[in-house]
Each structure stands twice: as structure tokens, then as C-alpha cells.
Curated annotation (Swiss-Prot):
Belongs to the universal ribosomal protein uS11 family. One of its GO terms (molecular function) is structural constituent of ribosome. Located on the platform of the 30S subunit, it bridges several disparate RNA helices of the 16S rRNA. Forms part of the Shine-Dalgarno cleft in the 70S ribosome. Gene3D superfamilies: Ribosomal protein S11. It comes from the Bacteria. The gene is rpsK. This is Small ribosomal subunit protein uS11.
């Protein structure tokens, strides 16, 4: 083994894509909110989640946490030249509307809002009811 040799790792530079129109996928569950912004082909430009921003426990499921996640994701996507988005919302969480409003407030033009929550045609048995 050669003494004094250091293995260098080079980090690949992020490609700066130039995308005008994209899609925002908002997944809002009872526990967390995740906002992913993609180009038209579905390749991820940016994403953020309430838990990733430092919200923990029951604070992750608040509308404010979803708003912050959408804002962070939108700012990162606008660096790629994004101007308008289609919004696809999935899940029953409380951060749905707050995330959409935050995307509009960040300066993105929302061209479509669609609910893509999967609804079973009587598939799997749901979890038992909570008794509090």
C-alpha cells in the first residue's frame, strides 16, 4: 500500500436544467407532507418535506409545515427556470390547500389542480378504528 496517497472523491455538479413548465406532486398524509416538483417527463427537479425541514412529531402534519415545504421546493425549482406548474394532490392530510397557496405565492403560475388520491374499489381491509 502506498503511503501518503489519498483517494479523492469528486462530487458531480448538479445539472442546471432549463424547464419552463412542470408538475408539482403534493402528497399530504395525516403524518407528513411531501412536495415534489418534476418536469413534464417526470424527472425530479426539486423536493421538500415537512420532516426534512426540521418539523417533528405532530408539527409535521400542520398546514404551516406543508406551506414551508412547498415554498422551499418552489424556490429550488425556479432556479431551473420553472414558471408554470400543474398541481397533483394526493392524500387526506391537512396541508393540501396550504401547499397549493404557497406555490402560487412563490411566483409560480398554477395551470391545473387535480386530485389524484387513490380510492379503492373495496380493496384491502382498512385499519381498525382508534378508541381514544
Amino acid at each position: 500500500m502506498a503511503a501518503g496517497r489519498v483517494k479523492r472523491t469528486t462530487r458531480r455538479k448538479k445539472e442546471r436544467k432549463n424547464v419552463e413548465h412542470g408538475c408539482a406532486h403534493i402528497r399530504s398524509t395525516f403524518n407528513n407532507s411531501i412536495v415534489t416538483i418534476t418536469d413534464a417527463a417526470g424527472n425530479t427537479l426539486s423536493w421538500a418535506s415537512a420532516g426534512g425541514l426540521g418539523f417533528r412529531g405532530s408539527r409535521k402534519s400542520t398546514p404551516f409545515a406543508a406551506q414551508m415545504a412547498a415554498e422551499t421546493s418552489a424556490k429550488a425549482a425556479m432556479e431551473h427556470g420553472l414558471k408554470s406548474i400543474e398541481v397533483y394532490v394526493k392524500g387526506p392530510g391537512s396541508g393540501r390547500e396550504a401547499a397549493i397557496r404557497s406555490l402560487q405565492a412563490a411566483g409560480l403560475e398554477v395551470t391545473l389542480i387535480k386530485d389524484v388520491t387513490p380510492i379503492p374499489h373495496n380493496g384491502c381491509r382498512p385499519p381498525k378504528r382508534r378508541r381514544v
